[in-house]
Amino acid sequence: MSTAFVDQDKQMANRLNLSPLERSKIEKQYGGATTLAFISNKQNELAQILSRADILKIASYDCAAHALQAVLDCGPMLGKRGFSQSDIVKIAGNIGGAQALQAVLDLESMLGKRGFSRDDIAKMAGNIGGAQTLQAVLDLESAFRERGFSQADIVKIAGNNGGAQALYSVLDVEPTLGKRGFSRADIVKIAGNTGGAQALHTVLDLEPALGKRGFSRIDIVKIAANNGGAQALHAVLDLGPTLRECGFSQATIAKIAGNIGGAQALQMVLDLGPALGKRGFSQATIAKIAGNIGGAQALQTVLDLEPALCERGFSQATIAKMAGNNGGAQALQTVLDLEPALRKRDFRQADIIKIAGNDGGAQALQAVIEHGPTLRQHGFNLADIVKMAGNIGGAQALQAVLDLKPVLDEHGFSQPDIVKMAGNIGGAQALQAVLSLGPALRERGFSQPDIVKIAGNTGGAQALQAVLDLELTLVEHGFSQPDIVRITGNRGGAQALQAVLALELTLRERGFSQPDIVKIAGNSGGAQALQAVLDLELTFRERGFSQADIVKIAGNDGGTQALHAVLDLERMLGERGFSRADIVNVAGNNGGAQALKAVLEHEATLNERGFSRADIVKIAGNGGGAQALKAVLEHEATLDERGFSRADIVRIAGNGGGAQALKAVLEHGPTLNERGFNLTDIVEMAANSGGAQALKAVLEHGPTLRQRGLSLIDIVEIASNGGAQALKAVLKYGPVLMQAGRSNEEIVHVAARRGGAGRIRKMVAPLLERQ
């Protein structure tokens, strides 16, 4: 093609306002000049069915002119068959996209008859070699079914670059791998990635050598089951001995290697480990940074940017937190780029770290900059924005809030509801699911607070769907709607519901009641806890634990780990004089496993400082008990200097959130003293669940409450019983109540009780209705 013709085509293609970088990217592909010419000649036709971004995506591959022509030829027919525009772009936007579109047209009917959905077909066709993959699925599906593979297995294997080769490889090597102990699930996991065929053959070749080096079958599957798994296995064999000499454990090597780009990450640990070590990064920190997608780049970026980040006030621990996720390199660079702008908008360093310290942290920071002002105009405060952005998928969550808030408002969801649902992993999907599934759930009798509780956790969208799917069956089994909400309103709620259905009969046969099952299942990780109870119950009984003990231990966040920790540590704790009741008391809370380990670790030092065994059990036997024990060790000397007795310290630390309460006493004690509160008052307010928040609320709202005629004693009474929420409720509704003739004495009497905030709201509700 002549230079003049190419130049002319560049000019014509530029009608799409292609930037120099975009034109260059297209031109570098095989047939790029032809693609530019095609775009310029057919831009009106293309624009009728594709967005600018779609055209660029398809054009960024070899021979893209053919793919774009195929979109024009096949797109309308595929649209009539139910394929979306994003499906068509996904199929066309790869090497061989034209052939893939034609293959979908030709084979979709036959694949549909075999039970493959439109989504399945788009997933398999939308990769390099998609046409060959669809044909291979048709040819090999019967053989796969005969060997016990499900349709989902076939789609997972086929739905990657080189899917056809992966399907053939599975049939070739599955018998041999099966003889070596690899399960069908292992084989699907290894094969179901780009380069799956090579990974399977590499497992076959290297497994004996890896086994001799001490790597388990689980390790091998973890390493092999990623894009580039074959290279990662070779790198483990080549670099493992040197890494072991450097002090890295086998488990650490497997963790670093077991991600996309694992081979490069291992090499980078060897190359940069010494330099990072000199800068003060520990081996554990290096492993944490390296053990993610893009770990090699993250290590290099830490080395490059650490000095500049430290100058900005970021500690090494915070740098590691931001770098130690998928996309950590981009997150660090984005922090450096955007931190000044974020600080100008009143985001604190802690906020920036929370947003950046997740998979996709870079995108989340950019979304905060982009959408923050609009969200503020909609009434969301900085804390709301940080809560929504500070999770995996935070960028998508912020975008979803902007897009869906008007409709959610129409459906009666409040701003706190939206923040609660959006502020988790998968928050964007949860908001979408609330809109799509909410009406059906309301028809079934679930209230708006129920829907928010179910949706407001990691996996909220799946939990809502599971409630719709399983509720009728669960009700037939005798579970009430409040039971269902309690089970699903946690991380992994969908799995917990399924586990209840699957395991309830066996658990009932073992003597567990329905309330027991709900208590165990109704926490984060409830599905695993139910299974662990089934697996470990006999061992617990043999050791003298009652059924009530098992339920108490299992019925919390992390119940599975707590059950295992009790079995592992009970003997040592018994040798140190802790009774079975003590062990159950410590283990039977959120984070019980960590609390048991902390008791073993810190008991000797605490004894030296005069704390009794009963003190230790009281401190450890609450949610966050491990942190509370550590906080006692850290702060006891300073608290002692300030006049707090050992009994005071135990009393403050021995509640949910005890660690935070001790820290709050240290932080706020002097100011509270200046405002007239004595040591006894401070202990009284701090020594409850949520004591830290109560002290902070007294500091913030105490002066205003004093101006309204409340005494110090009144404030202490409210804070010590109703806590921070009760103080805030008195602040908000006190004037309305006093206008209605209620005295301060009456208000304090109502607020200074457990649930005081709710009582105040109930008291004021009729008055607000009249206004």
UniProtKB/Swiss-Prot annotation:
Cryptic repeat + repeats: 742-771
Ranges of the Core repeat repeats in the UniProt entry: 83-115, 116-148, 149-181, 182-214, 215-247, 248-280, 281-313, 314-346, 347-379, 380-412, 413-445, 446-478, 479-511, 512-544, 545-577, 578-610, 611-643, 644-676, 677-709, 710-741
Alphabetical UniProt keywords: ANK repeat, DNA-binding, Plasmid, Repeat
Example of a GO MF term: double-stranded DNA binding
Mapped Cryptic repeat - repeat ranges: 18-49
PROSITE patterns membership: ANK_REP_REGION (PS50297)
Residue windows of the ANK repeats: 216-245, 348-377, 579-608, 645-674
Cryptic repeat repeats by residue range: 50-82
Region (BuD domain): 83-709
Superkingdom of source: Bacteria
Biotechnology section: After addition of nuclear localization signals (NLS) and a transcription activation domain, can be expressed in both human and plant cells and will recognize and transcribe a target sequence; more than 17 core repeats are necessary for this function. The N-terminal cryptic repeats effect activation, while the C-terminal cryptic repeat is absolutely required. When fused to the FokI restriction endonuclease domain functions as a sequence-specific DNA nuclease in vitro (called TALE-nuclease, TALEN, PubMed:24792163 or BuDN, PubMed:25004980) and with an NLS, in human and yeast cells.
Keyword DNA-binding on entry: yes
Similarity field: Belongs to the transcription activator-like effector (TALE) family. Bat subfamily.
Record remark on domains: The protein is composed of 20 tandem core repeats (the BuD domain) with 1 base-specifying residue (BSR, residue 13), which recognizes 1 base pair in the target DNA.
Primary role: Binds to dsDNA in a sequence-specific manner. Also binds a DNA/RNA duplex when the recognized sequence is in the DNA strand. Each tandem core repeat recognizes a single nucleotide in the target DNA via its base-specifying residue (BSR, residue 13 of each repeat); altering this amino acid changes sequence specificity.
UniProt-recorded name of the protein: Burkholderia TALE-like protein 1
Gene: bat1
